[in-house]
């Protein structure tokens, strides 16, 4: 018997077939550099920086920026941001720099140039006759890179969220060591004219390069990162959520995964922890692999590990975390089942801790405590393990164990308890729910059952 087939009758004729559905047509690609060459892009001819500054600033004021010119200028302006490498810097077998080397952002990557001249038009008129200073270049670079961050902000953020961020960014780039070069609200006005610039590969690449540099190198102009920080772990929300989750519940990755009681986690856990990646290497190219073009479709995104992502945020909702309540549900990854498991895990980790004495007045007190603890352990091992209580919460002698939680779920037939539903409704009903968020899902799914 073929386990994948179903049998039924059509007009008295027996039909046997294998139902096939649309599968994920994308191939997840792991970031890797196999040829020992730094990530690279190709831009037009390197400009005269004074001419380029005046042209790009003019375009910023007129809200008419040329993306090719902006990228060419950003690459050329890297020379203003020299710093000292604090340690030998290697990633994927490539020596980026040695300890003590003087480096700039373009030391991290390879920027190839053609002979094609840029436009360098003065769309906003000629406002600056003298040559710009380094603080003026730094301010322009900071404002341009901030267009990346603004274009990554989702439309679901309500009110004046984006405008407020744009105003705060402008304030950063008009105070020392930077200098005011644009009028108030210029950044937001210009952003509206280039709202999708985060999808331009070269602009994204340069934002990631600047971010990787300033995240490691102490520099006067490190605040430029305010516009590029979103390139760090970009499209890695699944892996980032898991990392935050294990810190939140105070378990190791191995201990946490033991609580993942569902077959759909198997493929995702294998995908997320593929051997050979530099996930744990500080300042690796891995951190910026999406912006540097090292992977087409991230295997670490919320969609790639949707069941894990859903579970983590249902647990977060149970614990009242605003970030989880606002996160977007991955609708195709069993959210109803994940909400059930999330309720049990939320109960297990919420309002409950594992505590022990770790500090003592002197060595004698420490030794007495350790001796007493050993005696307790011996007594526990000698116990025949008989449980006299019918209360499922005392089903296991160990307060935090996968076995105890799994037993509770099985005893309840894989359904949520009333107390879980009340908690879910309580946290979600007091929250202004965004469309397709976990708060909205919990409200719609469980509010009638409370």
Curated annotation (Swiss-Prot):
Instruction: Tell me where in this chain the PTM Phosphoserine is found.
Output: 389
Q: InterPro entries of this UniProt entry?
A: Rhabdo_ncapsid (IPR000448), Rhabdovirus_ncapsid_C (IPR023331), Rhabdovirus_ncapsid_N (IPR023330), Rhabdovirus_nucleoprotein-like (IPR035961)
Protein name, as recorded:
Nucleoprotein
Assembly and partners are described as:
Homomultimerizes to form the nucleocapsid. Binds to viral genomic RNA. In nucleocapsid, binds protein P and thereby positions the polymerase on the template. Protein P acts as a chaperone on free protein N to prevent it from aggregation before encapsidating genomic RNA.
Q: Which UniProt keywords apply?
A: Capsid protein, Helical capsid protein, Host cytoplasm, Phosphoprotein, Ribonucleoprotein, RNA-binding, Superantigen, Viral nucleoprotein, Virion
A GO CC annotation recorded here is:
ribonucleoprotein complex
The record describes its post-translational modification as: Phosphorylated by host CK2. Unphosphorylated protein N seems to have a better affinity for leader viral promoter encapsidation. Phosphorylation of protein N in ribonucleocapsid may stabilize the interaction with protein P, thereby playing an important role in viral transcription/replication.
- What role does it play? Encapsidates the genome in a ratio of one protein N per nine ribonucleotides, protecting it from nucleases. If expressed without protein P it binds non-specifically RNA and therefore can bind it's own mRNA. Interaction with protein P abolishes any non-specific RNA binding, and prevents phosphorylation. The soluble N-P complex encapsidates specifically the genomic RNA, with protein N protecting the genome like a pearl necklace. The encapsidated genomic RNA is termed the nucleocapsid (NC) and serves as template for viral transcription and replication.
| Places the protein is found | Virion; Host cytoplasm
GO molecular function, one example?
Answer: RNA binding
Highest taxon listed in the record's lineage: Viruses
- Return the similarity comment: Belongs to the lyssavirus nucleocapsid protein family.
Q: What else is known?
A: Displays a superantigen activity in human and mouse, activating mostly V-beta-8 subtypes of T-cell receptor.
Q: Which organism is it from?
A: Rabies virus (strain India)
């Amino acid at each position: 018997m073929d386990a994948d087939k179903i049998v039924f009758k059509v007009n008295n004729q027996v039909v046997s077939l294998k139902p096939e559905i649309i599968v994920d047509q994308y191939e997840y690609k792991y970031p890797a550099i196999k040829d020992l060459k730094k990530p690279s892009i190709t831009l037009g001819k390197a400009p005269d920086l004074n001419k380029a500054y005046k042209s790009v600033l003019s375009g910023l004021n007129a809200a008419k920026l040329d993306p090719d010119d902006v990228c060419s200028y950003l690459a050329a302006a890297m020379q203003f941001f020299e710093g000292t490498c604090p340690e030998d810097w290697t990633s994927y077998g490539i020596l980026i720099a040695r300890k003590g080397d003087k480096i700039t952002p373009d030391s991290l990557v390879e920027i190839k140039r053609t002979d094609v001249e840029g436009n360098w038009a003065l769309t906003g008129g000629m406002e600056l006759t003298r040559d710009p200073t380094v603080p003026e270049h730094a301010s322009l670079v900071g404002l341009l890179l901030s267009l990346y961050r603004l274009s990554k902000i989702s439309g679901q953020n309500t009110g004046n969220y984006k405008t407020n961020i744009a105003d705060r960014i402008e304030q950063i780039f008009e105070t020392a060591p930077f200098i005011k070069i644009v009028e108030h609200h210029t950044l937001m006005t210009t952003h509206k004219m280039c709202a999708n610039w985060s999808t331009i590969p070269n602009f994204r690449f340069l934002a990631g390069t600047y971010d990787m540099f300033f995240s490691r190198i102490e520099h006067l102009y490190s605040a430029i990162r305010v516009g590029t920080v979103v390139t760090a772990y970009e499209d890695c929300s699944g892996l980032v959520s898991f990392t935050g989750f294990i810190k939140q519940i105070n378990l190791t990755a191995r201990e946490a995964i033991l609580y993942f009681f569902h077959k759909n986690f198997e493929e995702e856990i294998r995908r997320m922890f593929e051997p050979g990646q530099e996930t744990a290497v500080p300042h690796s190219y891995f951190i910026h692999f999406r912006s540097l073009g090292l992977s087409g479709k991230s295997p670490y995104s919320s969609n790639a590990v949707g069941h894990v992502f859903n579970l983590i945020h249902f647990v977060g909702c149970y614990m009242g975390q605003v970030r989880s309540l606002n996160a977007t549900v991955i609708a195709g990854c069993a959210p109803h089942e994940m909400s059930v498991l999330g309720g049990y895990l939320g109960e297990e980790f919420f309002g409950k801790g594992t505590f022990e004495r770790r500090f003592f007045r002197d060595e004698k007190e420490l030794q007495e405590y350790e001796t007493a603890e050993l005696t307790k352990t011996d007594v526990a091992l000698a116990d025949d393990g008989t449980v006299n209580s019918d209360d499922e919460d005392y089903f296991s002698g160990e307060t935090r164990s996968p076995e105890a939680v799994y037993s509770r779920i099985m005893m309840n037939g894989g359904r949520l308890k009333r107390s879980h539903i009340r908690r879910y409704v309580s946290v979600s009903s007091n929250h202004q729910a965004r469309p397709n968020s976990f708060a909205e899902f919990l409200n719609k799914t469980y509010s009638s059952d409370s």
